[in-house]
């Protein structure tokens, strides 16, 4: 039985790597130009770190909503987790924080669980590493990193009611390139849509996604300053020593 399992594991890994280019960096990336398939091979160490996933417009066929170089949304703070079947991307709830030594920390953790944003079936295993297919995440109109503006009641109030809307065109979309480095992975994709507004036309964008690992020893938080060009967000600070939640930026 052990031999059969080992043979099956080797066969699965051979399938995902066949014809693909294997690059090592932040973690191993397997990209097949012919099939368009993109795989991440994650070691156990990848599941103990936090990452930033940034989503930027690299080029566009219509500047109504975004121009080249503009951030599409607020960068996501994420972490990978896994079970026997799947790997998950968890969205870290960084807006709400508490000191880990505070008496309310245990209760806080139960009420601010980091939600699972996306799940990937484990496609293969290799020497303790797990391999997942991330083609659809980076090569299709994934909701959390979509280049289409989300229309809501608030967006209508701020003049975004006429944002470009469209249906995703899979046959006109592709992952263009993948580059790996020791601390980051860069992925650029062309995503195409058929607009569904008053004027129906093709709409294509090139989106650049950056996945980079954060330091194991986090930098101390500081107040937001427009003179410093780093990402910032609001913090709701919970404490048993105060009778209200303190908000800071």
Regions from the language model: what does each represent?
Residues 2-249:
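Auxiliary tRNA-acceptor-end handling modules of aminoacyl-tRNA synthetases
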């Amino acid at each position: 039985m052990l031999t059969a399992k080992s043979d099956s594991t080797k066969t699965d890994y051979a399938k995902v790597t066949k014809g693909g280019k294997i690059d090592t960096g932040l973690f191993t990336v397997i990209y097949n130009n012919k099939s368009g398939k993109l795989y991440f091979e994650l070691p156990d160490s990848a599941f103990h770190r936090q990452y930033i996933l940034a989503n930027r417009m690299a080029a566009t066929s219509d500047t109504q909503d975004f121009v080249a170089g503009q951030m599409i949304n607020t960068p996501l703070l994420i972490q990978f987790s896994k079970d026997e079947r799947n790997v998950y991307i968890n969205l870290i709830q960084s807006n709400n924080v508490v000191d880990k030594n505070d008496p309310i920390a245990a209760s806080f953790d139960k009420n601010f669980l980091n939600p699972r944003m996306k799940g990937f079936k484990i496609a293969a295993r290799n020497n303790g590493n797990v391999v997942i297919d991330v083609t659809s995440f980076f090569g299709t109109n994934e909701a959390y990193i979509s280049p289409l503006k989300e229309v809501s009641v608030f967006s209508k109030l701020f003049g975004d009611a006429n944002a470009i809307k469209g249906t995703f065109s899979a046959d006109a979309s592709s992952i263009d390139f993948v580059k790996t480095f020791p601390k980051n992975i860069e992925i650029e994709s062309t995503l195409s849509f058929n607009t569904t507004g008053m004027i129906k036309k093709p709409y294509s964008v090139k989106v650049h996604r950056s996945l980079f690992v954060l330091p194991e020893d986090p930098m101390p938080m500081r107040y937001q300053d427009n003179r410093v060009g780093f990402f910032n967000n609001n913090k709701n600070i919970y404490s048993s020593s105060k009778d209200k939640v303190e908000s800071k930026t």
